[in-house]
Curated annotation (Swiss-Prot):
This is Urease subunit gamma. GO terms for cellular component: cytoplasm. Pathway: Nitrogen metabolism; urea degradation; CO(2) and NH(3) from urea (urease route): step 1/1. GO terms for biological process: urea catabolic process. It comes from Agrobacterium fabrum (strain C58 / ATCC 33970) (Agrobacterium tumefaciens (strain C58)). GO terms for molecular function: nickel cation binding; urease activity.
Length: 100
């Protein structure tokens, strides 16, 4: 299987998001990379489903809450930027203050 670096990155984010979801189901608080992966995966999958950029920017801020991440993590993440493929092309989506 020959994957481009971009495809490998997408796969890694998707796998990290799966791990994060399982940890949340068990009641384990997420660390920095897990929180970023979960939000990023939400945006990428939303784009794939055809959701609008503005919708994903707003909805991405409600994927996880402060009580689902380790202490201090919410304060470390100010913006999450994800390059996602939409039906009309690739766009950069920025989620501001994603953990509220």
């Amino acid at each position: 299987m020959n994957l481009s670096p971009r495809e490998k990155d997408k796969l890694l984010i998707s796998m990290a998001a799966m791990v994060a979801r399982r940890r949340l189901e068990r009641g384990v608080k997420l660390n920095y990379p897990e929180a970023i992966a979960l939000i990023s995966d939400f945006v990428v999958e939303g784009a794939r489903d055809g959701r609008a950029v503005a919708d994903l920017m707003e909805a991405g801020a409600h994927v996880i809450s402060r009580d689902q991440v380790m202490d201090g993590i919410a304060d470390m993440i100010h913006d999450v930027q994800v390059e996602a493929t939409f039906p009309d092309g690739t766009k950069l989506v920025t989620v501001h203050e994603p953990i509220r």
